[in-house]
Amino acid sequence: MKKIITLSAPPPSQFSFLSEFQFSLPELRQIQFKSYYYFIYKNLISELNIFPEIFDLNQEFQFELLNKEYKLIKPEKTTIKFHYNTYSSDLYVTCRLLRRKKKIEIQKQTIFIGSIPLIDYQSTFRINSVTRVIINQILRSPGIYYNSELDHNGISIYTGTIISDWGGRLKLEIDSKTRIWARISKKRKVSILVLLLAMGLTIKQILDSVCSSKIFLDFLKEKKKKKEHLQSTEDAMVELYKQLYYIGGDLLFSESIRKELQKKFFQQRCELGKIGRLNVNKKLSLDIPENEFFLLPQDILAAIDYLIKIKFGIGTLDDIDHLKNRRIRSVADLLQDQLKLALIRLENSVRQVMRRTTKRKRLLSPKNLITQTPLIATFKEFFGSHPLSQFLDQTNSLAEIVHKRRLSSLGPGGVTRRTAGFQVRDIHFSHYTRICPIETSEGMNAGLIASLAIHANVNNWGFLESPFYKISKNVKEEKIINLSAGEDEYYRIATGNCLALDQGTQKIQITPARYRQEFLAIAWEQIHLRSIYPLQYFSVGVSLIPFLEHNDANRALMGSNMQRQAVPLIKLEKCIVGTGLESQVALDSGNVMITKQSEKIMYTDGKKISLLNNTNETVNTHLIIYQRSNNSTCIHQKPQVISKKFLKKGQVLTDGAAILKGELTLGKNILVAYMPWEGYNFEDAILISERLIYEDIYTSIHIERYEIESRNTNQGPEKITKEIPHLENSVLRHLDKNGLVIPGSWVETGDVLVGKLTPQETEESLRAPEGKLLQAIFGIQVTNAKETCLKVPLNGKGRVIDVIWISKKENSSNYEKIIHVYIAQKRKIQVGDKVAGRHGNKGIISKILPRQDMPYLQDGTPIDMVLSPLGVPSRMNVGQIFECLLGLAGYFLGKHYRITPFDEKYEREASRKLVFSELYKASKKTGNLWLFEPENPGKSRLLNGRTGEIFEQAVTVGKAYMLKLIHQVDDKIHARSSGPYALVTQQPLRGRSRRGGQRVGEMEVWALEGFGVAYILQEMLTIKSDHIHARYEVLGAIITGEPIPKPKTAPESFLLLVRELRSLSLELDHAVIFEKNLNIKFKDV
């Protein structure tokens, strides 16, 4: 049995003082749970509290919600996975109807107003039995931000941008002539005096309040010269309305102008919210109450003063990309927005019903006024179509956790991938310990999709925090404090490498530290804080990469992304070299079952575990058996306990997908060699041994779901039956008497899974007398139904593991039933599959060699995988070499290693010394001197499997942890003989799902021209593409064996071009010039 050795620190005697600081990693999904808890206990109540009182047209009746009297019903435990149900809680609120004048209560009822989706134990939402997750959005925080920019003349101007809680913006700017404007659109601006007057101030109040009244006096003089009067609030509102909405002509003030400005301008651009008010007060040194959420005139006056100071060099500009100016919109904020929208819709619905009922003089009651549709429909729309509500990535357990910890700058109120510039995407110094600088998407979303650092947390204000150790002269008084991005700038923070220093040497050592956006080397006495963990700066995915510090950041990014694409294998194996976080990821994923208290195992089998708790109650825990994930991988739990055994709280009961004995296991430890082999590993191609196939090393299970609906049509209901005419019995052999496939059957491509007949009208030719005569003569049976069976698609063969029949939904007109058929496939690794390591070293399987032909070690062990040595130097991911060599030593020593990255903090070349020392131990213990050869450390001589000769040069050989990715050739391979054509161009469609063709573009044509294959090129551009007549002629020629005729007419794409030109009134014509006409004079032509 192998033992796990942790090599994350030197012997304890060197820094025994650190034993005082025992800490554990935070729960990796707590951002989801904490935020939803805040929504239920805070935001839900606050939204119900602001629901207004509603009156009828005569102001006689009053309807109101008693906000303190509400309850959420605990949902029943049902198998929602298969029945299109949503895991939600019914919300009941007490409503009251009373007479307004006398305040007499007419009726009081507790009414069901809708359902609120609940978060489950895996921090996900089940909507229509589909697992979804709400990802967090990072946005610019509401408040005021000062910046300098260039105007259209290239002159530098200073601006102050006020961002409202709704996302609207009001920009104040001071130009080169020291005039202050309020910009209301890209092309329109008004004087700041107009805005202040429209907000209710008088000219005297404005002049008395600002520090530089000369600016406003100059503006008033300019208005007098133009004979424009601007003395009152009404005049200013008219002026503002003209600039915003009015087209032309004279305009007089009216109350409708005030209401429209209030609704469309002030509410959208001047409502700061709680966080905006906090930021404005802090920036402008104001003491306005925190419950004043709207922008006040004194806010504008203070903002103007600060803008003038910046103009004259006093004050500081803001960095808009700093994390102190950005906040997280988590589950609570997004759901609160939807609840607010639903209650507005409910308010409008109640008002309409109330007015309609009183107008018809019918009896009013709270139950008749309330409808559940607004709340249910709003949440359904949000979870179904909102860009931040996404299908949970369930490829493996790591993919689930990373998806739940994702941060997105996209979505409503955020940036777009086309307009986002480099500054928004770039790494910012304030991301340190809060947002991972490595893990992000590749392509258009680079820098816009990020991941939380492993210790980062979101506070109640929506700002990212990170923990630090506070340094004290007395070591026992040191403690952990959480700081947000703006707070840590005032401290000198030592980086993670100082943790390994001895307490006695720290006082005289120069330590690298971070202070005010710079990295310094200062004495230890000047340090205020220090990091708590070397991996504190990185996300979960990056933290699982061993020897991370030896990799280029781009390859670490690819490695972290590809770990999320690893397919769970049938035979699991722990990595020999890891970082120690594998168990934390496995436990926090929610895919393993753990004991909630001290319990005794009474019974266990493959489907359930029976537990006896402290109160002598037997609790049956049912396991997840061969369940399909969102990514068509297999979720399967196996018990890891035996009967009659006592367990403590928190112990693991089961394994899950890609989880073995409580640790994340994404791949396999296999023997790799870095060497070229007859060109088969050219350009990242990979050569593998047949052992990986025959011993099911990389075999995985994939479950596909096929769906068919049975509806009521105009001709009658569709019928599920086994009796399908015109189909052979061989394709119907797996159907039962009801027309459904029998679970456990092995089905091949083309086999019928569900037999279905759709009614249709009989053709007119068969209803005529001559048609009936032909039926009688030839015995033709007239069928009035069309076969629309569900069949196994191409590459869909496998074992049917389940058939689910979902009954008719309520309140649905033409919906009858849905049938789901689940087919499991066991896929072995094959040519075309993608494999990768944890260091961004990826490749495609190019050839599978027999074991006897593979290069082999000096003890006769054949190599499992041959990688290209040219894939290491240029990519600069040397961590894979350290991993495979240490893995080889661990394999022969029977050890597993858990290594914290950045071990060079202990001494120079620490990783190299560790690897070589372990290889030396392995060679001594096993007697295999080739494991460590002093002249070629880390390399050994290999023998050619075909000839038995020793290769000329020593080869790097080791045990690497390689992953099989979800990009598999079975899902991608595609061929087309015939298929659908586009209606306009008559060319084959595009894409595998449409049975499309391969595009031959401009460069492909050049390549074929270069090889001189004229006939192949002509066929590709005409017969195989869009020449309609030639297609039919070629088919006939092939059948009869005649030579393929040459096309005599133009292809359809040329005819399409002619039609397009005709639509532009251009006509193409052609003329033949004979030899006798060549002497025609030029002027005649």
From Swiss-Prot:
InterPro entries: DNA-dir_RNA_pol_bsu_ext_1_sf, DNA-dir_RNA_pol_su2, DNA-dir_RNAP_su2_dom, DNA-dir_RNAP_su2_hyb_sf, RNA_pol_bsu_bac, RNA_pol_bsu_CS, RNA_pol_Rpb2_2, RNA_pol_Rpb2_2_sf. It is found in: Plastid, Chloroplast. One of its GO terms (cellular component) is mitochondrion. Pfam families: RNA_pol_Rpb2_2 (PF04561), RNA_pol_Rpb2_3 (PF04565), RNA_pol_Rpb2_6 (PF00562), RNA_pol_Rpb2_7 (PF04560). Its EC number is 2.7.7.6. GO terms for molecular function: DNA binding; DNA-directed RNA polymerase activity; ribonucleoside binding. One of its GO terms (biological process) is DNA-templated transcription. It catalyses: RNA(n) + a ribonucleoside 5'-triphosphate = RNA(n+1) + diphosphate. Keywords: Chloroplast, DNA-directed RNA polymerase, Nucleotidyltransferase, Plastid, Transcription, Transferase. PROSITE patterns: RNA_POL_BETA. HAMAP family: RNApol_bact_RpoB (MF_01321). DNA-dependent RNA polymerase catalyzes the transcription of DNA into RNA using the four ribonucleoside triphosphates as substrates. PANTHER family: DNA-DIRECTED RNA POLYMERASE I SUBUNIT 2. Belongs to the RNA polymerase beta chain family. In plastids the minimal PEP RNA polymerase catalytic core is composed of four subunits: alpha, beta, beta', and beta''. When a (nuclear-encoded) sigma factor is associated with the core the holoenzyme is formed, which can initiate transcription. This is DNA-directed RNA polymerase subunit beta.
